[in-house]
Amino acid sequence: MTTKGPESEHPSVTLFRQYLRICTVQPNPDYGSAVTFLEERARQLGLSCQKIEVAPGYVITVLTWPGTNPLLHSILLNSHTDVVPVFKEHWHHDPFEAFKDSEGYIYARGAQDMKSVSIQYLEAVRRLKSEGHRFPRTIHMTFVPDEEVGGHKGMELFVKRPEFQALRAGFALDEGLANPTDAFTVFYSERSPWWIRVTSTGKPGHASRFIEDTAAEKLHKVVNSILAFREKERQRLQANPHLKEGAVTSVNLTKLEGGVAYNVVPATMSACFDFRVAPDVDMKAFEKQLQSWCQEAGEGVTFEFAQKFTEPRMTPTDDTDPWWAAFSGACKEMNLTLEPEIFPAATDSRYIRAVGIPALGFSPMNRTPVLLHDHNERLHEAVFLRGVDIYTRLVAALASVPALPGES
C-alpha cells in the first residue's frame, strides 16, 4: 500500500488521528476530553448531543440524526471510548501520538479497538448528510465508557435506564475484529465471561511434615479437572476445521494465591480462572459441573463468581431476517465476503442483545492482522478509509429497512 504526504492527508484520517491522541487508557481514562471531542463533532454535523451519567464520572454520549418516520425503531451505532493499557517500551512509536509511517500505517492504542469504528460512524453520517440523504429510521450513535473493564459502569447500566429505552433501538452495530484474509468477519453472538475464584481450605502446619488434607492437594485436584476440560475443548476445536474459536468454551488459569512462608503449610489457597462459555452451553448444567469438580476434590473447596453473564443471545443470520438481509445485501453489493462467527471474547453487544435488540459486531478491517490489545496496534489509512465507505453504505441500508410488523 502507498500513502499520500501529510499535506494531502484525507480529513477523515486527520480526525481519526486526533481522536486517537485523546488518552482514554484504563485504569484512568480521560473521558472528559473524549466527551468534549464528541460534542464538537455533534455541533459540526448538526446533530443533537445527549450526555447521560450512568455512574459518577461515567458519561455516555449519544449523537442523534432523526429519521422521517418516528414510528419506526431506530438504528444504534455503538462504540466504546476507553482503551486498554500499554507497555510503551515495546512500541515503535508513542501509542498516543497516532504516528503515521511512510507506508500509511497509523500506530496507536485504539487504532483497531475501536476508535477507528467510532470515526467511521461519524464520517459515514457526515457524508450521508452532506449528500442530502434522509432516512425513515432515526440513527443514534452511542459512545460509552468502561467497556474494556467489563462495561459494568457503562453499557450494563445504560440498557436499564429510561434514556436507553427512549432510543427505541431496533437493531445495533458494535465492534468486531480485523481479518488477515480478504474476507470480513461479522459477529452474531459471543461467549459469556465467567470469572471464577476457587478457594480450598485444609489443615495447616509445619512444612517439614506429611500433613493430610491440605488446601494445596485439594486445589490441585480442581485445577486438574478444569485443565482437563480445557484440553478436551482445545482438541474439539482442532479436530473440526469448520469450528471457530468462539464456538467452544475456553478457560485459562490466571492467578494462584496462598501461603505466608516457605516453611508453613497454608490453611487456604485459591485459583482464579477466566472461562469464556460458548452460547450453546447449558449454563445451569455447566455451573453444576463446576460444583461437582469442587465437591470431588474434598471438603472445604468452594467457588465464587467475580463475573458471570448468563444471557447469551444469537442475532439471526439468515435472509428471512430483515436486518441481516439489509446488512448482508449491502455487503454483497460491495462484493464483500462475510464470515459470520461467534465473538471469542466479550463486548458491549452482550448487554444490547440481552435486552432483546439484535446486534452485529463488525469492524471493516480485512487484510489486516488482529492487533487489538497488542504492542504496536496499528491500522493502514487505506483500510480505515475503505471502512468509511463501507459504513456509509451499511448505515444507509439499515436506516432504510421498511416498517416491520408492529411498527406502524
UniProtKB/Swiss-Prot annotation:
The N-terminus is blocked. The lineage of its organism: Eukaryota, Metazoa, Chordata, Craniata, Vertebrata. It comes from the Eukaryota. It comes from Rattus norvegicus (Rat). Its main location: cytoplasm. Belongs to the peptidase M20A family. Keywords: Cytoplasm, Hydrolase, Metal-binding, Phosphoprotein, Zinc. It is an enzyme of class 3 (hydrolase). Its cofactor is Zn(2+). Zn(2+) 2 binds at residues 113, 148, 373. The keyword Hydrolase applies. Binds 2 Zn(2+) ions per subunit. InterPro entries: Aminoacylase-1_M20A (IPR052083), ArgE/DapE_CS (IPR001261), Bact_exopeptidase_dim_dom (IPR036264), N-acyl_aa_amidohydrolase (IPR010159), Peptidase_M20 (IPR002933), Peptidase_M20_dimer (IPR011650). Homodimer. GO terms for molecular function: aminoacylase activity; identical protein binding; metal ion binding. Transmembrane segments: none annotated. It holds the Pfam family Peptidase_M20. The modification Phosphoserine is found at residue 408. PROSITE patterns: ARGE_DAPE_CPG2_1, ARGE_DAPE_CPG2_2. Zn(2+) 1 binds at residues 80, 113, 175. This is Aminoacylase-1A. The active site is at residues 82, 147. One of its GO terms (cellular component) is cytoplasm.
